[in-house]
Amino acid sequence: RSLWWPRGKVLGGSSSINAMCYIRGHAKDYDEWEQLGAEGWNWKNVLPYFRKSEGNVRGTSALHGGDGPLTVSDPRYLNPLTPVFVEAATQAGFDANDDFNGERQAGFGLYQTTTRDGKRCSSAVAYLNPVRKRKNLKVITKATASRIIFENGKAGALVYAVDGKGGFCEAAAKEIILCGGSINSPQLLMLSGIGPAAHLRQHGIDVLVDAPGVGGNLQDHLDVCTMHKCTQDITYDNINQALAGLRFVLFKQGPGTSNVAESGGFWRSPLAEDERPDVQFHFVPAQLDDHGRNKVPGSGFTLHACFLRPKSRGRLYLTSNNIQHKPRIEAGYLSDADGFDMKVMLEAAKQSRRIIAQPAFDAYRGPEMFPGDTAQSDA
């Protein structure tokens, strides 16, 4: 089965195409990174950088920055179903949480978003736009890095193509920062001769460093979705786009300012291995099939639940020695030997159903479209 893996080939990277929910990792995540060998990456050390980068509209606090370049905002508009979901979560016994990046992560509430004046605040908007006129900054668009040239064991230059035409090369005065993301960074390293030796030779690439870990240990958060029809035509499925656009242009208000996934929560399942929540929920007042790429008629809502720390691992493989040829992504979803990931996902799906079954949804809950009424066992 093939799944869609979108990436942000645009200024700002995937921060220009994501759902804009502003979520840091749990404090223990960073402490664990350091325990695994990433010296200096503990929570105490990274928090000042989170605060420095953040421009939260709520202002400065012990855990938040108020004047950083990345604007973090509260919702300007909520779909009528969003507060219904939050109320239903409370009725189901979950704690309310008005700040998922505060003292505790667990609980349900509204997401803050990386938005400014009702518009997306990507990393390009936050960091690049303010310095575009610097004389020592050159931004090349429509460019694809194809290989890093190493000199005496150090990255010395970058080979790239523009508009598909190769032959360009830039030498590094000081350093090359590799920031192609979880897919393109390992692909570029392998094309440059750093990766599993046998795999590189298979594609005619000279091996500089035999590094089996490059392309490996791939982890992703798989969603399990519960989708219902809505008995009232109030979701984002049939929104008047022209009217929403006009309202946004004139007043910077209305549905055009929404990130759609306006609410959600974090839950510590019975299978959690420590104090951290291990499941995250996103409530979407729309019918999302295949990332919203398939239009579903009528009105509905979707509750997404994902396991935050899967044990399953995947790997990235080259398909050729050409950067233009997309790599093969073997995600390895639900492939862990003891089936632990599947067990957590089943618990998450049950909680999704329990939340939607609460009285708050009685006036809105239509038939369950997915997984459907016939799905009544763990099998």
Predicted regions and their residues:
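FAD-dependent oxidoreductase catalytic-site/capping-region signature
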Residues: 47, 53-101, 109-111, 231, ...
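N-terminal glycine-rich phosphate/pyrophosphate-binding loop and immediately adjacent elements
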Residues: 1-52, 208-213, 221-230
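Conserved redox-cofactor binding core of oxidoreductases
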Residues: 34-156, 161, 173, 225-244, ...
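Cytochrome P450 core scaffold surrounding the K-helix E-X-X-R motif
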Residues: 27-35, 150, 314-316, 326-330
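General small-molecule cofactor/ligand-binding pocket signal
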Residues: 97, 138-140, 206-210, 282
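Stable alpha-helical elements in mature extracytoplasmic
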Residues: 26-29, 42, 81-85, 123-127, ...
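Glycine-rich loop(s) and the adjacent beta-strand/alpha-helix scaffold that form part
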Residues: 148-151, 155-248, 254-255, 321
